[in-house]
Design a protein with these regions (language model features):
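Short, surface-exposed loop/strand segments
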Residues: 1-101
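Acidic metal-coordinating catalytic centers involved in nucleic-acid phosphodiester chemistry
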Residues: 74, 79-186
Length: 186
């Protein structure tokens, strides 16, 4: 069972990003999670970062794509945003924001049901580490242990449950929640 079964209807990219940022705030509060707004010149290919070297980027399909089209969109999004880690103009942004050496780049998607994106993530990891090896002075913001990790909604079951079931919400999510399913916390 997927945690997405508790969310009714289509989730927009903005709603997915808002939900992911809330989840990262909860999970990485002790690591001082900092969100990055895409306003004022862009987000540098990340939605936020922690002080222990985790950055994340969200992606939600714009519509119900075929498996092939969905993979193509995910692959292209990952390639574009990981590519920003290697471009001098984005490196400057990351350093100006105080992003520490990046150990993990999380690609956060609603569902992970295509092994090709895992393979592509490994290809991108190798490319980033090869670039770092070829020019270590330029890529000091990349850890020697750099990893690309695929995360999906089910990885944040606890955080999403807390967000959805919170009795006193001081935030607004653009989501409809199904109330006919009972959560199993075991």
């Amino acid at each position: 069972m997927s945690v997405l079964q508790f969310i009714e209807g289509y989730m927009s990219g903005n709603a997915w990003e808002d939900l992911c940022v809330m989840c990262y705030r909860m999970r990485y509060q002790d690591e001082h999670y900092t969100p990055i707004s895409a306003a004022q010149g862009g987000d540098g290919g990340i939605e936020g970062f922690t002080q222990n070297g985790i950055v994340h980027q969200c992606y939600c399909p714009e519509k119900n794509y075929s498996d092939e089209d969905n993979y193509t969109h995910m692959r292209d999004k990952m390639t574009k945003d990981i590519g920003k880690l290697l471009k001098p103009e984005y490196i400057k942004k990351l350093k100006d924001w105080g992003v520490p050496s990046i150990k993990e780049w999380h690609f956060v998607i609603p569902e992970q049901n295509d092994s090709r994106i895992v393979k592509h993530a490994e290809t991108k990891r190798k490319e980033v580490l090869a670039a770092k090896k070829s020019n270590p002075k330029l890529y000091t913001h990349i850890s020697d242990e750099f990893k690309v990790i695929i995360k999906c909604a089910d990885d944040f079951l606890l955080e999403i449950s807390r967000i959805v079931l919170a009795p006193h919400k001081d935030y607004h999510l653009n989501l409809a929640i199904r109330d006919a399913i009972t959560l199993d916390y075991t």
